[in-house]
């Protein structure tokens, strides 16, 4: 295996568990290094296993509106420069951006140095969303940049079979790979003994949706199916937990 740098550009929403689960499959003996973009909650610092910390570089920047705007319009040059510096210091031969394909400008510099650049594609199409106008504008600009980077990327990986087929039809001349989605159910979750106060004394099992609450995820269909299926609602509770707004009427009983 060629010496590899895995780059995670965000721990936002589901990306935090996704990245940490992948990183934690490695051991210190593997010839792999990690550059992880953290926020105020120090998600990666907390969730990456200690024996890998010597292989990790944690990049931290406040998740402020100003930093978001600056990064959206100008890119994060400091972060890109850190990628290049780590490649030089560690003699990296492969860089894998696992949250999105690499920015075109960074990918070109790396390729000119003989470094293979791999990008994971998560969303070929932008998610449906209903947000404030300024957030919709930001999402549109981000999507435009993401599409540009995907179009440029020479080696792409995806965790979705349908998306892999679509990539094959869109980019017949690219190097494309499918890899099954890593489980986000960690050992800590499986063996956990702590309960939120709201769930500690329930009198029957529950079906849990946990994650950011957004319209495109079809939570309204999940709720409708649950309330209209006696086999479910008589023997289970439905628990919807996460940040966001539930955009449909519901029976709060």
Regions found by a protein language model. Give the residues of each.
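A short, glycine/small-residue-rich beta-strand->loop->alpha-helix junction that serves as a flexible
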Residues: 6-21, 40-42, 100, 214-217
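N-terminal strand-loop element at the rim of the active site
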Residues: 8-13, 25-74, 163-168, 178, ...
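Conserved donor-binding/catalytic core segment of Leloir-type glycosyltransferases
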Residues: 198-217, 223-226, 238
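Membrane-proximal helix-turn-helix segments that form the acceptor-binding/catalytic region
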Residues: 84-86, 105, 112, 136-156
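Short donor-sugar binding/catalytic loops of nucleotide-sugar-dependent glycosyltransferases
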Residues: 10-11, 210-214, 229, 244-245
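An aromatic- and histidine-rich active-site surface loop
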Residues: 76-81, 94-121, 125-126
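Glycosyltransferase donor-sugar binding loop
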Residues: 37-42, 183, 210, 237-250
């Amino acid at each position: 295996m060629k010496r590899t740098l895995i780059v995670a550009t965000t721990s936002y929403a589901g990306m935090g568990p996704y990245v940490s689960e992948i990183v934690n499959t490695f051991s210190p003996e593997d010839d792999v290094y990690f550059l992880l973009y953290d926020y105020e909650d120090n998600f990666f610092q907390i969730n990456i296993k200690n024996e890998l910390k010597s292989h990790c570089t944690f990049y931290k920047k406040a998740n402020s509106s100003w930093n978001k705007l600056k990064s959206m319009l100008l890119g994060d040059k400091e972060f890109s420069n850190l990628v290049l510096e780590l490649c030089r210091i560690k003699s990296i031969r492969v860089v894998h951006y696992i949250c999105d394909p690499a920015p075109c400008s960074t990918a070109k510099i790396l390729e000119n140095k003989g470094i293979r650049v791999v990008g994971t594609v998560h969303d070929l199409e932008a998610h449906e969303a209903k947000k404030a106008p300024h957030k919709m504008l930001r999402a549109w600009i981000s999507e435009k940049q993401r599409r540009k980077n995907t179009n440029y990327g020479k080696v792409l990986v995806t965790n979705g079979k349908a998306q892999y087929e679509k990539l094959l039809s869109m980019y017949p001349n690219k190097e494309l790979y499918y890899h099954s989605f890593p489980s986000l159910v960690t050992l800590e979750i499986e063996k956990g003994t702590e309960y939120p106060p709201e769930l500690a004394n329930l009198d029957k099992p529950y079906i849990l949706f946990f994650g950011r609450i957004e319209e495109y995820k079809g939570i309204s269909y999940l709720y409708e199916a649950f309330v209209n299926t006696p086999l479910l609602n008589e023997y289970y509770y439905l628990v919807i937990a996460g940040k966001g707004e539930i955009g449909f009427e519901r029976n709060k009983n």
